[in-house]
From Swiss-Prot:
Belongs to the phosphohexose mutase family. Catalyzes the ATP- and formate-dependent formylation of 5-aminoimidazole-4-carboxamide-1-beta-d-ribofuranosyl 5'-monophosphate (AICAR) to 5-formaminoimidazole-4-carboxamide-1-beta-d-ribofuranosyl 5'-monophosphate (FAICAR) in the absence of folates. Its EC number is 6.3.4.23. It comes from the Archaea. Pathway: Purine metabolism; IMP biosynthesis via de novo pathway; 5-formamido-1-(5-phospho-D-ribosyl)imidazole-4-carboxamide from 5-amino-1-(5-phospho-D-ribosyl)imidazole-4-carboxamide (formate route): step 1/1. This is 5-formaminoimidazole-4-carboxamide-1-(beta)-D-ribofuranosyl 5'-monophosphate synthetase. HAMAP family: IMP_biosynth_PurP. GO terms for molecular function: ATP binding; ligase activity, forming carbon-nitrogen bonds; magnesium ion binding. Its cofactor is Mg(2+); Mn(2+).
């Protein structure tokens, strides 16, 4: 892990009046960049030339850093270019996937918003389970391996893969049949299979809950809630049951979009309690904790119990559903507030208070 002192040494050489907010052109970059501009920051996007159109058309980026391929963002010349523009990187799922988690931890020497040490805790299922379970949250039962399957389960794989390759099954035979099918399609590798995470299949309504922990205020804020629109499962359910059986199509769970939702108000105490508990436990296990945005992906069962099956320890893709604010984020100040603008506002306040060390790593 890059020492915090080294990152702060780099930041101390910056022109503090010309900080640029930067991210990779993908995932949640539109509201990250737009939010930064609304707070008065200069912005830059890292992109390839064949994917720069959205950032030009929407006008969210002041500068463009072009790479031949996204994995080039970890190269030293790109890092130096970022440091030269006084960059603070806002990481999201695509940034971590392209840069590589090892590089983010050990070689990417550019100041980054949030706690880079916690990113591995969302990527590795055992660490994620340790944090979620240690927080006292209700999580699905975990199975040690396919031979232990004794009922409906969901099989997942590590990393920010947008649900690709996930599948449900009920027996060990079904597990291996689907594994072989996905390997034949090139969706899974032997390494993926070795790291398969098998958990109880919880029946309930899906809620992805987006929080922001402010280290400057020591407070967890509820920013918004969304649901995912997944292919092919959301298209498959439109097919009559008798036709589904005849077609014999195995559903996939690839995230193609998100839509905003509100949760019944009587569940909000539970929602806040979950966020508070996770933020508190994160401070203990991965100091300084869950800085900035995080997400708890949950299912609400018929007993109105929220079961958390996954977390994001950085800005989640579902925050795109409230680029102009959510029914919850607007309650804090009475203004539309995206997650991107909330991030930029925290950075701005940290600079004003000379407490930037509290929000970057």
């Amino acid at each position: 892990m890059i020492p915090k002192e080294e990152i702060m040494g780099i930041f101390e050489k910056y022109n503090k009046d010309e900080v640029t907010i930067v991210t990779v052109g993908s995932h949640t970059s539109l509201h990250i960049l737009k939010g930064a501009k609304l707070e008065g920051f200069s912005t830059a996007v890292i992109t390839t030339r064949d994917r720069d159109i959205p950032y030009k058309r929407f006008g969210v980026a002041d500068k463009f850093i072009y790479v031949d391929k996204f994995s080039d963002i970890s190269k030293e010349e790109i890092q130096q270019q970022l440091r030269d523009m006084n960059a603070i990187i806002v990481p999201h799922g695509s940034f971590i996937a392209y840069c590589g988690l090892d590089n983010v931890e050990d070689t990417f020497k550019v100041p980054m918003f949030g706690n880079r040490a916690i990113l591995r805790w969302e990527a590795e299922r055992d660490l994620e389970g340790q944090l979620l379970g240690g927080s006292g949250l209700r999580i699905p039962k975990k199975y040690g391996g396919p031979d232990d399957i004794d009922g409906p389960v969901m099989v997942k794989f590590p990393g920010a893969r947008g649900g690709r390759g996930y599948f449900p099954c009920s027996t060990v035979e079904e597990f291996w049949r689907k594994i072989d099918e996905f390997k034949a399609k090139g969706i899974l590798t032997e390494d993926d299979v070795a790291k398969a995470h098998i958990e109880e299949y919880v029946v309930g309504a899906n809620y992805c809950i987006h929080y922001f922990y402010s280290p400057l205020k020591d407070q967890v804020e509820l920013m918004g809630i969304d649901r995912r629109y997944e292919s092919s499962i959301d298209g498959l359910v439109r097919v009559p049951a008798k036709d589904q059986l005849e077609l014999s199509i195995d559903p996939s769970y690839v995230i193609t979009g998100n839509f905003p939702v509100v949760i019944r108000e009587s569940l909000l105490p539970q929602v806040f309690d979950m966020g508070d508990k996770l933020a508190t436990k994160a401070k203990e296990l991965v100091k300084p904790g869950m800085l900035g945005p995080f997400c708890l992906q949950s299912l609400c069962n018929e007993n109105l119990e929220l079961v958390v099956f996954e977390m994001s320890a950085r800005v989640d893709g579902g925050t795109n559903t409230f680029m102009n604010g959510s029914p919850y984020s607007c309650l804090y100040t009475g203004e539309p507030l995206s997650m991107g603008q909330r991030i930029a506002r925290e950075i701005k306040l940290a600079l004003e208070l000379k407490m930037i060390d509290k929000v970057i790593s």
